[in-house]
Amino acid sequence: MEVSNGSGLMANHDTVDLNGRVMHEVYQMAQDHGLVFVIDIGRPGNNCYQVDALAKVVQAYPQMKFVVCHLTAPQHNQMELLEKNLQQLNYPNVYFDIASLPNNTKQPYPFTEAQSYVRRAMDILGKDKILWGSDFPAAMNYCSYREAYAYLEDSKLFTQEEKEHLFYHNARLVFSL
C-alpha cells in the first residue's frame, strides 16, 4: 500500500494516521484474507512517514506479515535514522525490501552508501528479513536494471549465503512461493 505524499494515499488526502481506525479496517481486511501487507511510508520528514505508528500496528497484527518498502527510505547520510527505524520495527512479522536505495541516497554506482545501509540492516535484523527489490520502472531515472542488482551481487560486504537470502530465499518465505 503506497501511503506516501508523492504518489500514495497522502498525496491526495489529508494525513491518515497509520494506527488509526480507518487504517485498522484495511489491516484487518488484509489479515482476514491471509495477505502480506506491503507498505511504503514515504520519505523521512513527510507527514506519511509514521514509523512510531507503524510499530504499534505490526504489534497489533502479529499473525500478518508486513513488508516495509525501501528499508524505511533512508536518504543520504541517514544511517542513524535507519538504525533507529530498524530497531523500532524489528518484529518477527516484519520484513523490509530495499527497492530504490540507490535512488534515495543519490550516490554514483556502485552505490556504496546503499550497500552500507543494507549491510547495517543485515547486522541488525539478520539475513532472513531483507528482500531485494528494484522499484523499476520508476528507478530507471537513476540506474540501469543491471546496476540495481549488481551493486549488491558484486559487493564484498555480503557472503554468498546472505546474497542468496536477499535475492531469493526471503521472498519465497515471505510470499509463500
Predicted region positions:
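Acidic (Asp/Glu)-rich catalytic clusters
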Residues: M23-H33, A55-P62, E83-N93, R120-G126
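Mid-to-C-terminal alpha-helical segments outside catalytic/metal-binding sites
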Residues: R119-R120, I124-L131, M140-L177
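Active-site metal-binding loops of divalent metal-dependent hydrolases
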Residues: V3, I41, L71, D135-F136
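Structural preference for beta-strand elements that scaffold enzyme active sites
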Residues: G34-V38, K65-V67, N93-D97, K129-L131
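Conserved, mostly hydrophobic/aromatic
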Residues: A30, H70, F96, D135, ...
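Active-site gating/metal-coordination segments in enzymes
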Residues: M1-P44, D97-L101
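Histidine/acidic-residue-rich catalytic or RNA/ligand-binding cores of hydrolases
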Residues: C48-L54, H76-L86, K106-S116, M140-L152
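Aromatic-anchored helix/helix-loop segment that forms the rim or "lid"
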Residues: L86-D123
